[in-house]
């Protein structure tokens, strides 16, 4: 039975609540429990765990919620008593430490530390991007520990930081060292002359700790987040940091560590590094390079990268470490034993999987299985820090429970010959992970021996002798119970591989002449130079433990005890940030700049082509564009779903309605708002790759916009119809009408839109409902050229007849025009002018000049108006379509007083249900 307790306004950070959940779950009689803040993301986690209740769903992001699956009602009192006691103990511990000064707002934080240059953010991902944006506005670099930040937000933040001469490290950045100050989950590493840039937290930890134990040190180790080398992000932070470290006189050697980047990003980085003026070592985990280049070294393992860097600093070759172990008791290959590897560090797990595959001589990559780095012939490598294991639960660096469970399962498997582990030391990690695992290891070794089996436990300890847990103490404890402890992860992997009778080869690499590419070098900003050369001044937003650590290292720090503002409502928070951004600015002046852009626009129809020729996103699989702000297929109204069916049939992705709907519901088709790809669409707005679109170019700014052609009135795709008649018309428009108009427009050198608008408005058009004059004016422009073109006479007649009969034909041209004009205007990114209005039958959305691509949405209305005979309000569909771009640009309904009122516009209607035959 599920029991729920909601603690209103009781905010606690996620790590504290994970530890609390772990403690309470051990109470006898508790089948399942989760204690989290009621953020939207956490509510999803509750739901996935089968713990969603009405009380939970009604709670706000500022409320702590306890949901427990228990049979005894009295047990709930025990749970809450222990919860309160846990918080009392936490408060007592905090009280014992002097700690950084705490504040409750950005304004107070900035008053306390006005020259802060780094914001460390560790709050729920839904809010992290908003706070990072605020930090950038205040001139601060950002270290974003938070995950679950959208790729779109990451791109915006990093572009903004680059423009301001700042850096965003992250999101999901777990490790950093800035001027010997450890940020987040980091080790206590000696200062030195090696700089590191990494898209990998535990990869940085392994590198820095090996370097430290070899007697060298690190200037700065900059985490950039796992997606920085994604094609969409483009390596923004990586490239800026490469420039900054080349400029830093304290850096003698640079190491770059990452998973393999996107090809275009990799090429850009390789070109830049080819003319880097200092020795550099690269490691793309999972790749096996075959050679080095002069002063440009390519490592296979983290150990090799660290040894290369230390050797370059010292000017000597550093030999590999060896394992002090008696191999005579190891298994032979014919014993067919397996390795079970359970890691808390993702990069270390990745390296282990790579080395085991190498040893097994795997030619074909094994199947990817969620939660596993490797699952091959009984050998498994698991990253226990993966989201599959940590949603709503403590990370394995701070809680041994999941690893203990996995080790028990491993020993129960009679094929297991070796169990491979990492022990992560450092700030943020368990205070004695080795000690916490000892009882289980001792018990499992005895269990295997009693069964007449050998199971070798092999570990690597990632840490330094400066770490508060004590490196030597951890190694000693493990060896006391018979664990083979190796100097680094590569050696631990090799030992485990040899323990089951196999090995891998790491041949010596030749050094080739470096091929230098003429690539541009950036000039690091003064703010980046300061970040890498001085102790940071930090505003810590979130986990208090991060502030406590940096203060120990002599940093000025203010602890911002963050709680979700505006009741956790993300949309309201965005509005508040928008208003803050404009506080003290001349909004009227900004608005005048935007309007000046609108007035200066010179839209010209330059072509008519297939949509996929001008919209790259339509070439990335099965993609359909729709009207309005983003909407899932299941939330689309019936007419829009019907339009999607028509598009699928038109594209021949299916040959009947049933298969089309099955495909649409499968998730295989990717839906994108037209507005996201410089397009607009009437009603459903459905646009697929091979549909014909007008191309309108704003000659003033050079930007383009696109819109499908008007099909006329009646059974048409935009109203949700998808019969054979509808699909055949679309194909005729693709094959005959579009190419004919495209050729005519190109022959004319384009058609200026402003003169057509001027003529038509004087004749009574308003360009949304009334377009007769403009449609005929367009026909007047193209008809003479069409009559002279070489083409089939019937096709010529059909084109002219269609244009003559379609009174609304100009609407779609006007929509593309409005989009081209407003897209140019919103490049100002200041002011409060609305730059887009649109509907998707589910939500009404607007964009504002000063907020860029951000959507502000609300429930869509159902229009009230006149209906055709036989229909009434019950048939009406909630409003949809991008055609309100006409009103946005200043025509449509806004010109009603200027044009002659010829007709009251009919309501949008839902009669498509009767058009499916």
Language model segments and positions:
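Anaerobic metallocofactor- and corrinoid-dependent redox/one-carbon enzyme cores
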Residues: 5, 48, 199, 321-405, ...
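Catalytic-core regions of core metabolic enzymes
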Residues: 1-521
């Amino acid at each position: 039975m599920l029991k729920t307790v909601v603690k209103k306004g009781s905010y606690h950070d996620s790590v504290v609540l994970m530890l609390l959940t772990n403690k309470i779950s051990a109470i006898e009689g508790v089948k399942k429990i989760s204690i989290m803040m009621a953020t939207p993301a956490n509510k999803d986690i509750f739901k996935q765990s089968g713990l969603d209740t009405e009380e939970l769903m009604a709670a706000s992001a500022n409320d702590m919620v306890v949901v427990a699956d228990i049979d005894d009602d009295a047990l709930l009192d025990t749970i809450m008593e222990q919860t309160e006691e846990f918080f009392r103990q936490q408060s007592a511990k905090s009280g014992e430490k002097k700690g950084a000064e705490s504040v409750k707002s950005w304004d107070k934080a900035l008053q306390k530390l006005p020259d802060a240059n780094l914001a460390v953010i560790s709050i729920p991902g839904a809010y992290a991007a908003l706070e990072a944006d605020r930090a950038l506005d205040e001139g601060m670099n950002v270290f974003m520990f938070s995950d679950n930040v959208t790729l779109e937000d990451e791109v915006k933040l990093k572009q903004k930081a680059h423009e301001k001469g700042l850096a965003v490290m992250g999101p999901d950045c777990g490790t950093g060292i800035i001027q010997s100050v450890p940020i987040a989950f980091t080790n206590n590493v000696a200062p030195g002359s090696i700089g590191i840039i990494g898209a990998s937290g535990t990869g940085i930890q392994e590198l820095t700790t090996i370097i430290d134990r070899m007697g060298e040190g690190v200037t700065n180790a900059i985490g950039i987040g796992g997606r920085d080398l994604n094609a969409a992000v483009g390596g923004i932070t990586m490239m800026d940091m490469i420039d900054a470290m080349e400029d830093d006189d304290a850096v003698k050697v640079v190491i770059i560590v990452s998973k393999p980047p996107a090809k275009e990003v990799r090429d850009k980085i390789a070109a830049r590094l080819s003319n880097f003026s200092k020795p550099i070592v690269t490691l793309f985990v999972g790749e096996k390079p075959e050679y080095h280049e002069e002063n440009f070294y390519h490592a296979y393992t983290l150990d090799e990268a660290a040894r290369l860097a230390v050797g370059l600093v010292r000017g000597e070759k550093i030999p590999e470490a060896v394992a002090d172990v008696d191999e005579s008791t190891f298994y032979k290959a014919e014993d067919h034993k397996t390795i079970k590897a359970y890691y808390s560090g993702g990069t270390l797990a990745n390296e282990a999987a790579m080395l085991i595959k190498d040893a097994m001589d795997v030619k074909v990559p094994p199947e990817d299985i969620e939660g596993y780095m490797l699952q091959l012939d009984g050998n498994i490598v698991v990253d226990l820090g993966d989201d599959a294991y940590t949603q709503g639960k403590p990370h394995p660096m701070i809680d041994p429970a999941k690893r203990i469970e996995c080790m028990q399962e491993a020993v129960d498997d009679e094929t297991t010959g070796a169990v491979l582990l990492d022990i992560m030391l450092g700030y943020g990690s368990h205070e004695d992970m080795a000690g916490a695992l000892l009882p289980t290891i001792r018990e499992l070794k005895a269990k295997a021996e009693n069964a007449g089996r050998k199971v070798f436990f092999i570990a690597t300890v990632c840490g330094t002798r400066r770490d508060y847990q004590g490196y030597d103490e951890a190694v000693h404890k493990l060896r006391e119970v018979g664990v083979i402890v190796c100097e680094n992860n590569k050696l631990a992997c090799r030992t485990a591989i040899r323990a089951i009778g196999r090995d891998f080869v790491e041949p010596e690499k030749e050094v080739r002449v470096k091929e230098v590419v003429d690539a541009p070098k950036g000039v690091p900003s003064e703010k980046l130079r300061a970040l890498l050369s001085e102790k940071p001044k930090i505003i810590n937003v979130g986990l208090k433990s991060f502030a406590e650590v940096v203060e120990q290292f002599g940093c000025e720090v203010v602890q911002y005890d963050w709680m979700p503002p505006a009741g956790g409502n993300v949309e309201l928070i965005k509005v508040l940030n928008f208003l803050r951004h404009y506080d003290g600015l001349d909004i009227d002046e900004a608005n005048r700049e935007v309007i000046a852009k609108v007035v200066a626009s010179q839209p010209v129809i330059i072509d008519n082509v297939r949509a996929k020729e001008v919209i790259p996103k339509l070439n990335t699989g099965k993609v359909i564009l729709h009207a309005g702000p983003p909407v899932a297929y299941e939330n689309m109204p019936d007419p829009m779903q019907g339009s999607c069916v028509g598009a699928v049939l038109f594209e021949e992705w299916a040959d009947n309605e049933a298969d089309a709907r099955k495909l649409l519901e499968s998730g295989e088709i990717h839906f994108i708002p037209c507005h996201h790809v410089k397009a607009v669409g009437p009603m459903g707005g459905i646009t697929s790759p091979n549909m014909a679109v007008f191309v309108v170019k704003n000659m003033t700014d050079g930007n383009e916009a696109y819109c499908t052609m008007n099909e006329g009135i009646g059974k048409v795709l935009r109203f949700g119809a998808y019969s054979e008649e509808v699909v055949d018309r679309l194909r005729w428009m693709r094959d005959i009408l579009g190419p004919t108009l495209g050729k005519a427009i190109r022959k004319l050198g384009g058609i200026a839109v402003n003169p057509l608008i001027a003529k038509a408005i004087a004749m009574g058009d308003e360009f949304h409902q009334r377009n007769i004059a403009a449609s005929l004016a367009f026909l007047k422009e193209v008809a003479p050229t069409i009559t002279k073109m070489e083409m089939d006479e019937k096709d010529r007649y059909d084109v002219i007849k269609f244009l003559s009969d379609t009174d609304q034909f100009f609407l779609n041209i006007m929509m593309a025009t409005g989009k081209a004009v407003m897209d140019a205007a919103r490049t100002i990114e200041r002011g409060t002018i609305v730059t887009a209005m649109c509907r998707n039958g589910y939500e009404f959305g607007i964009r504002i000049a000063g907020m860029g691509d951000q959507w502000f949405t609300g429930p869509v209305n159902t229009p009230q108006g006149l209906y055709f005979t036989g229909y009434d309000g019950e048939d009406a569909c909630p409003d949809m379509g991008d055609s309100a771009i006409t009103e946005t640009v200043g025509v449509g309904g806004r010109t009603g007083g200027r044009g002659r009122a010829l007709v009251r516009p009919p309501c949008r209607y839902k009669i498509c249900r009767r058009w499916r035959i």
